[in-house]
Each structure stands twice: as structure tokens, then as C-alpha cells.
């Protein structure tokens, strides 16, 4: 699916990708869920996240933490037009956000997979509700919110929803392929 460039396409992509992701998780066997992710034998999977996430819970928690970033920033800055704020957690930049992702992973190791799924379902609904409240112009025209930098607000929603869900599905498919030996 192409990257959404308008509100209607974003809503469809986020909704469809989330539903596919949840279905994929619900259809995973106990064996697939129980076995730790191990992509160390694949030279193509060298990015940090391939080594960081060890199971379905870790993937779900990653999505949930990024939902929280978006929800928190927008709740606190809904009416801010000419103010620059930090989107990422304090102390991190777009060059160092990998370290932030590692912190997300570390602080959620005690969360159960079932709880992680409920957390991400709830936060997805909240993100979609937040998304609905923005106009097409607020989402996809530049210079509406200074805090998004040279980007548009819609790109934050795309990255936090449809694109992130696609990333999660690719990771789960790769794990499933390894477990099943296909």
C-alpha cells in the first residue's frame, strides 16, 4: 500500500493495517509466540530493531510507546501553531531515537503479551480519535504546526500507525518463517 497522502487514505491504511496486524497475532500458534525472535543468521536484518525485539510483546510495546508519544505531544500542543517542541522523549533526537526505543524495550519487560495487546488496541483507538479531530489542511499542509519542523502533522500519524503496523507485520512474518522453517 502506498504511503497515505491525505486524511481519508490515512484512516483507511491505519485501520486496515491495524486489523491485519491484530488478526496476524491472534492467528499465531503457541509455538510461534513462545519462540524468541532470532534474526542473527540473516545478514539483511542488521538494523537495531531486529536484535532488540525478542517476541510479540516487544513489538506491541514498541507500537504502544510510539502511540503514547504522539498522543502526549498532541494533547499538550493541540492549539500551538508557532511553537517548536520536542516530539521524542527528552534527551533524544532523530539521530539517537534508537536509544530511546531501547529504553522503551527495557522498561516494559514485565508486561504480559496479552496486556501489551490490550494497551496497543486502546492506544490505537485513541490515536484514531485524535486523527479524526484534525482537518485535511492541519494534517497535510506544511507550516500549520511549527513543532513538526519541515514536515506535516500527517506524517507523524502515518509513521505511528499504518507504516509502523506494516513494519510490525513484516517482523512477525519473518519470525513465523523462521519458526516454520519456510
How does the language model describe each region?
Residues 46, 83-85, 93-95, 139-141, ...:
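Short, intrinsically disordered/low-complexity patches at protein termini
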Residues 15, 19-53, 82-98, 173-174, ...:
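Short N-terminal secondary-structure initiator segments
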Residues 5-8, 12, 46-50, 54-57, ...:
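Short, solvent-exposed segments of well-ordered alpha helices
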Residues 23, 30, 68-72, 79, ...:
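A generic secondary-structure boundary signal that marks alpha-helix termini
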Residues 14-21, 25, 56-74, 93-98, ...:
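Alpha-helical transition-metal enzyme core signature, strongest for iron centers
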Residues 29-49, 103-107, 111, 125-158:
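Acidic interhelical loop/turn segments
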Residues 1-13, 46, 68-119, 177-182:
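Short, helix-capping/interhelical loops that line the mouth of catalytic, cofactor-
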Residues 137-140, 167-178:
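Long amphipathic alpha-helical segments
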Amino acid at each position: 500500500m502506498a504511503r497515505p497522502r491525505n486524511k481519508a487514505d490515512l484512516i483507511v491504511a491505519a485501520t486496515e493495517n491495524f486489523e491485519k496486524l491484530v488478526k496476524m497475532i491472534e492467528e499465531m500458534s503457541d509455538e510461534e509466540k513462545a519462540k524468541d525472535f532470532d534474526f542473527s543468521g540473516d545478514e539483511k536484518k542488521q538494523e537495531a530493531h531486529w536484535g532488540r525485539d525478542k517476541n510479540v510483546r516487544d513489538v506491541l510495546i514498541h507500537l504502544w510507546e510510539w502511540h503514547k508519544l504522539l498522543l502526549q505531544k498532541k494533547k499538550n500542543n493541540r492549539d500551538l501553531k508557532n511553537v517548536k517542541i520536542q516530539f521524542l522523549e527528552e534527551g533524544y533526537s532523530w539521530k539517537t531515537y534508537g536509544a530511546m526505543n531501547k529504553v522503551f524495550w527495557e522498561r516494559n519487560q514485565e508486561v504480559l503479551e496479552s496486556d501489551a495487546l490490550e494497551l496497543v488496541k486502546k492506544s490505537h483507538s485513541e490515536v484514531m480519535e485524535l486523527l479524526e479531530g484534525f482537518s485535511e489542511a492541519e494534517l497535510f499542509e506544511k507550516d500549520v504546526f511549527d513543532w513538526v519542523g519541515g514536515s506535516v502533522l500527517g506524517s507523524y500519524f502515518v509513521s505511528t500507525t499504518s507504516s509502523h503496523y506494516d513494519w510490525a507485520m513484516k517482523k512477525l512474518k519473518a519470525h513465523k518463517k523462521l519458526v516454520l522453517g519456510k
